[in-house]
Amino acid sequence: MNTKILKALEFDKVKKQFTHFLQSEQGQMELNDLLPMTNQEKIERSFAEIADVAQIFQEYASFGFGHSQDISESLRRLELGADLNTQELLAVKRILQMSAELKDFYDNLENVDLQILDCLFEKIETFPDLQGSLQAINDGGFIEDFASPELTKIRHHIHQNEQQIRQILQEMLKKQGDLLAENLIASRSGRSVLPVKNTYRHRIAGVIHDISASGNTVYIEPRAVVNLNEEMTQARADERHEMTRILHDLSDRLRSQTDIIGNNAWLLGHIDFVRGKYLYMRENQASLPSLTTDQTIRLLSVRHPLLSNPIANDLHFEHDTTAILITGPNTGGKTIMLKTLGITQLMAQSGLPILADEGSKVAVFKDIFADIGDEQSIEQSLSTFSSHMTHIVEILQKANKDSLVLFDELGAGTDPQEGAALAMSILEHLRLSDIKTMITTHYPELKAYGIETEFIENASMEFDMVTLSPTYHFMQGVPGRSNAFEIARRLGLSEIIVAEAENLTNTDSDVNKIIERLENQTIESRRRLDNIREVEQENLKFNRAVKKLYNEFSHAQDKELRKAKLKAQEIVDKALAESDFILKNLQDKAQLKPHEIIEAKGKLKKLVPEIELSKNKVLKKAKKKRAAKVGDDIIVSSYGQRGTLTKRFKDGRWEAQVGLIKMTLQESEFDLVKSDKAQASQKRQAHLVKRTSQKAPSARLDLRGKRYEEAMQELDEFIDQALLNNMAQVDIIHGIGTGVIRDGVTKYLRRNKQVKEFGYAPQNAGGSGATIVTFK
């Protein structure tokens, strides 16, 4: 895009409005280099980035990362083999810190769905090791003592020397204070000295380093501290040497990472730039327009960014409209409207938010040309008309159907009749070339051209006849009219003179009356539109408030859910720890009897939180139908085992005989079984009983085709069930295969103290593919 348009529309001034929203020098550099784009995808990407930042600010109001310097020159020096000074290292350190902070911020983002910035955040790399090394440089650019053991040692020595020198000189101040010009310790050439009166210079032995301008004071280094000062000088030299070595070491560590650090710096600057664009949009009630492919432009309540308190106007430049012709007297705001269209297009094509309401649309032009204002060339001694015409000729040679052309006062600066004719001819050429054009003119001849010519639309600026001043409201579809007669009347010109003038221009008067009616209709339409927009704004505010409340509620709900999950996890962790303890105790026992298994499983059951069933009306009603009594058959819910009630205690608990074991149970821990249909009832109720089998316990376990871990788990459960059901003997089919499961079964049975004996089945019953187990 040609650079003349940027100067004509003061694009650089617009860019400066974004400066105070930026925090990084890299972001400022990106703003300085910003130019309008002609690639629609790139423009839409810029808008999507701003929309991403808007999402972030909606959830996190404090999104920012502080000031940072441009480190590109420092990185270039590193690549050339140079070492950085402390200030340069401090700038790099800040970039690394900001990278880590921004990466951490991104990793903790919630409730946002980033479309573009996701990939930028993910490209940021962190360098914890380098950050740790650069802690040797503090925020003041000073190398810390802990930067190296040698530096620690040197500075400790310097500190001790300083204390000794100060102590000696303090003693001399006390004892020989009357010989001194001032009672203080001075410094000359890096050495501690005393300001001695010239008349007593021979009373203090030492080295003279300086004499005051008046000659009354001599600065003497007492002999008692000469050696210490020599040591101090050497220590300072050692310190400088060690600091140089440290800077070289730190620079070497950074040298291999310059590309990545440089990319990080660019990413930080770019994100800062996008953040700045969003902040500008928020502060100025700007918006992100949509892009059209047919050169349609619809600007709603558009304002010029460089004006204070600008008047908002609507501008509709439809795809089938070739030109908009703004007519009317000067000082009405025609040029401002022309510039507003131009600068809005430049901002949008630069990926910047525009000062217009949401729902606005802009086109994407390959080039924008403008001839605005008085551009007379003094050096070329050209007249105003010649200057304008030279520029217009250049524009007509370069413009095409992908261009936008803006002409201010086309044809001005020459004879009005000839100027109007030239303006119409130029406009006709642009129309036939299908080039989008907006022009301003005060020539009345062009109004008729705009009315009669297809694809040309008239427009004007509103004038308040009460205050006799322009309102700067844009009236599209209404040509401008002269207000000379009405103004003359209001200013007191004789009615006879005004009436005579109106009679002399009777035709024009009729046209002006038609235009006046159009103006009134346009003003009324705008008033109604303003009312509609007020309602829309109220609805928008309401929708935003509802969305904010929903987000707050959603966040609170998520917080409570996370809290509940953490609490549940604590309960589960505690239960697992206790279950491990119980199982460990079982494994440690030499003998494991059936009642011990039941007791252990009872303890494990208690780890599961109990559900309050006392208020369950269905269960209450069901239990009332039949009360438990001694002799009833039951099924123990915890184990799915059948037993018989033998005794009821006063506290409501029951004693039950389950196999060979007596158990004490609550009523909620068992279900009644009708004695005459116990087996059938057990099957019917099995689906209601926790861990209850759907069929009678089997005396045979088939492990063929199982994985080793799965087989061992099933074997353990099978042996438990067999012991609980008082089985004397069971069969385990493991097959021959690789022998892994068979060996596992053998090892398990050898460890189990309840197994009396075991061995392979007879040849006709499976042989070495099955094992028969007999319990004690």
Swiss-Prot record:
Its EC number is 3.1.-.-, 3.6.4.-. ATP binds at G328, P329, N330, T331, G332, G333, K334, T335. It comes from the Bacteria. Residues 701-776 form the Smr domain. InterPro entries: DNA_mismatch_repair_MutS_C, DNA_mismatch_repair_MutS_core, DNA_mismatch_repair_MutS_sf, MSSS, MutS, MutS2, P-loop_NTPase, Smr_dom. It is an enzyme of class 3 (hydrolase). GO terms for molecular function: ATP binding; ATP hydrolysis activity; ATP-dependent DNA damage sensor activity; endonuclease activity; mismatched DNA binding; ribosomal large subunit binding; rRNA binding. Keywords: ATP-binding, DNA-binding, Endonuclease, Hydrolase, Nuclease, Nucleotide-binding, RNA-binding, rRNA-binding. Belongs to the DNA mismatch repair MutS family. MutS2 subfamily. Homodimer. Binds to stalled ribosomes, contacting rRNA. This is Endonuclease MutS2. It comes from Streptococcus mutans serotype c (strain ATCC 700610 / UA159).
